[in-house]
A protein has these predicted regions:
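Alpha/beta enzyme core
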Residues: 15, 86-197
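N-terminal capping/small domains of soluble enzymes
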Residues: 1-79, 84-86
Length: 197
């Protein structure tokens, strides 16, 4: 199964990969409302992989339910939806909507910045991780996986705070690439997520 954010919503790769051969399709992040993402350039190769600063661009939950779920239902594979948000309310509303659909599992991306609490990622505070997990479990019967951020001092403390069905390790590591000749950042957002190539 592909990692979230690497495979779109499945449609983008269905001409190249037989989705029936995958144990599951993990979608890119889906938010309550459409997100435009970050300005370009968003992706840059590095000597050790790739920096991406896409910014969770997506059309929002309404379009996802109307367009992407019916497409994915055509295949004999599980559907895991990555959920993103900027507030606890955002997460809960998306989870509530997805609970009424045929998706098999929800992956909660707690690497998102919490705009209600100064922009720190939800997944960097154990009490917030515990709170958001318990609130989500109250409103959905679907299994949930909490996608943890590596950008913490002690990930074991965060993992112990998660009372989900599973955890997803890990989101990308914060990194940057600088063009030393031009003395400029290579991605418009300055930093992005460092992953393998």
């Amino acid at each position: 199964m592909p990692a979230s954010g690497t495979f779109g919503s499945g449609q983008e790769y269905s001409e190249f990969v037989d989705l029936n051969q995958l144990g599951a399709v993990v979608t890119k992040g889906v938010s309550l409302t459409p997100w435009e993402g970050n300005p370009a350039p968003r992706i840059m190769e590095t000597s050790s992989g790739m920096i991406n600063a896409v910014g969770l661009q997506n059309p929002g939950i309404d379009v996802f339910i109307e367009r992407d779920i019916p497409f994915l239902q055509k295949f004999d594979t599980k559907i895991i939806v990555n959920v993103c948000g900027n507030s606890v309310s955002d997460y809960l509303q998306v989870v509530e909507r997805l609970s009424e659909t045929v998706v098999d599992m929800l992956e909660i991306n707690i690497s998102c910045p919490n705009v209600e609490h100064g922009g720190i990622a939800f997944g960097q505070e154990p009490k917030m991780v515990e709170y958001i997990t318990s609130e989500i479990k109250k409103i959905t019967p679907k299994p949930i996986s909490m996608k943890l951020t590596p950008n913490v001092t002690d990930i074991t403390e965060i993992a112990k705070a998660v009372e989900a069905d599973s955890i997803s390790l890990i989101n990308t590591i914060t990194g940057m690439r600088i063009d030393v000749q031009k003395r400029k950042f290579c991605v418009a957002n300055k930093t992005g997520g460092l992953s393998g190539s």
